Each structure stands twice: as C-alpha cells, then as structure tokens.
Amino acid sequence: MSRIGKLPIQVPAGVDVTIDGRTVAVKGPKGSLTHTVAAPIEVSKGEDGVLNVTRPNDERQNKALHGLSRTLVANMITGVTAGYSKALEISGVGYRVQAKGSNLEFALGYSHPILIEAPEGITFKVESPTKLSVEGIDKQKVGEVAANIRKLRKPDPYKAKGVKYAGEVIRRKVGKAGK
C-alpha cells in the first residue's frame, strides 16, 4: 500500500466535494477546482466527511498513481480553503517590479520593460519594488507562474542578481583571480 495514498483525506466544514465517475470537483470559500483522476484509481466518499483513494492492484504504475492522485485531491481541498502563495525576491541594481492593474511590469536590466499578465485564477501582490508574491487556489498554476517569472532573469551565480524564490539559497561562484 502506498504510504501517502492509503491516508484518508479530511474534508473540512464549508468544503463541498462531488465525485462524478473519475471527475472530482471541490468547492470551497475561495473558489472551485476540478480534477480527473487517472484510469485505475478510485475516489470514494466515506463517513464523517472523509475521502478515500484506492487502487485495484499493486502494479508499479498503479502504486505511483495512487499516491499522486491522493495528493492532487488533498491539494485541491487545501487550495479552496487556504489557497497557495509563492514569494519571490528581486535583487540587483535597478531591478524592480511594479503593479499595473492586475499585471506586473518588471525592469530587469533589459532595454525594455517586461509585462506579465495574470492568468485566470492567479493574483499578484507587490509588497515592495523588490518583493512580490503569486497567489491562487491551484498549487500547480501558482508554482508554474512563479517559475516563469523567475525564468525572466535567473539568479546570477557570481553576484546573485536576478529573480529568486524567497528563502532560496543561490550557490555562489568565485570570480576569476585578479593580479
């Protein structure tokens, strides 16, 4: 049995879960999400607001899908109740971000400003010109948008300039030895 997959998923009060065949729909105070579970995996409602994820046999692929499916459904429930957030920091001379409506405008050392539009379900919060956070209910989408923003100017290993995740440690390199 998958250690992650066999754990039941607690459904908090205020969250409505509907299972229609392989499709699991979760509705909560922050919004709603749907996910189609992979073919051999079954999701069922138990008593006391508990969801159980089961697999038909112990094939290697089914074991992997079992834990994955359970985690994806649990992430949906967490997303519609608490939401997800990914913090980013910008370091470097003249590097900054500012909000333009629901979009972001970056100055990252290029000859032009970079404009990022907020995808559906994602909001940006700019705390300062060097700190921002990406927020939403879908964990995968929040992580993807944050990774795309980081990709605009990855941290430089020599001076650690660029866009990085909050708390990320940049492995520094020693520059060439001067005479």
UniProtKB/Swiss-Prot annotation:
One of its GO terms (molecular function) is rRNA binding. InterPro entries: Ribosomal_uL6-like (IPR000702), Ribosomal_uL6-like_a/b-dom_sf (IPR036789), Ribosomal_uL6_a/b-dom (IPR020040), Ribosomal_uL6_bac-type (IPR019906), Ribosomal_uL6_CS (IPR002358). PROSITE patterns: RIBOSOMAL_L6_1. One of its GO terms (cellular component) is cytosolic large ribosomal subunit. GO terms for biological process: cytoplasmic translation. SUPFAM superfamilies: Ribosomal protein L6 (SSF56053). Pfam families: Ribosomal_L6 (PF00347). Transmembrane segments: none annotated. Keywords: Ribonucleoprotein, Ribosomal protein, RNA-binding, rRNA-binding. Part of the 50S ribosomal subunit. This protein binds to the 23S rRNA, and is important in its secondary structure. It is located near the subunit interface in the base of the L7/L12 stalk, and near the tRNA binding site of the peptidyltransferase center. HAMAP family: Ribosomal_uL6_B. Belongs to the universal ribosomal protein uL6 family. This is Large ribosomal subunit protein uL6. It comes from Streptomyces griseus subsp. griseus (strain JCM 4626 / CBS 651.72 / NBRC 13350 / KCC S-0626 / ISP 5235).
